[in-house]
From Swiss-Prot:
Disulfide bond entries: none
Gene source species: Latilactobacillus sakei subsp. sakei (strain 23K)
Keywords: Ribonucleoprotein, Ribosomal protein, RNA-binding, rRNA-binding
Family per similarity comment: Belongs to the universal ribosomal protein uL18 family.
GO annotations of cellular component type: cytosolic large ribosomal subunit
Biological processes annotated in GO: translation
PANTHER family: 39S RIBOSOMAL PROTEIN L18, MITOCHONDRIAL, LARGE RIBOSOMAL SUBUNIT PROTEIN UL18M
UniProt keyword Transport, yes or no: no
NCBIfam families attached to this UniProt entry: L18_bact
Function: This is one of the proteins that bind and probably mediate the attachment of the 5S RNA into the large ribosomal subunit, where it forms part of the central protuberance.
Gene3D superfamilies: 3.30.420.100
GO MF: 5S rRNA binding; structural constituent of ribosome
Name of the protein in its database record: Large ribosomal subunit protein uL18
Length: 119
């Protein structure tokens, strides 16, 4: 019987493969993105110390719940960039979490770049 591969399992394989190659430091933290069906989450991570430096998601009160998911991802990208710059982090490494660079992930990344993050 032919079975379809589970999309989330293949994404997790991609993510672990990429995570072996990139990691965040205190000088250049990792901007990690997680996408669920309803929400999107972004956080700056210092992998050496194992600490989250800044985070934002669609569950935050600053993000408006109206609009499409792409618009919400843009708001989350702008918010995490503002919090990162406020904490003193401008240069980051973007970790798309095994997702394709398209749609919500690309919208979050471009909004973060427009609000002061460099990657």
């Amino acid at each position: 019987m032919i079975s379809k591969p589970d999309k989330n399992k293949t994404r997790q394989k991609r993510h672990t493969r990429v995570r072996g190659k990139i990691s965040g430091t205190a000088d250049c933290p990792r901007l990690n993105v997680f996408r669920s069906n309803k929400n999107i989450y972004a956080q700056l991570i210092d992998d050496v110390a194992g600490v989250t430096l800044a985070s934002a998601s669609t569950l935050d009160k600053e993000v408006k719940v109206e609009g499409t998911k792409v618009e919400q991802a843009q708001q989350v990208g702008a918010l995490v960039a503002q919090r990162a710059v406020k904490a003193g982090h401008k240069v980051v490494v973007f970790d798309r979490g095994g997702y394709l660079y398209h749609g919500r992930i690309a919208a979050l990344a471009t909004a973060a770049r427009e609000n002061g993050l460099e990657f």
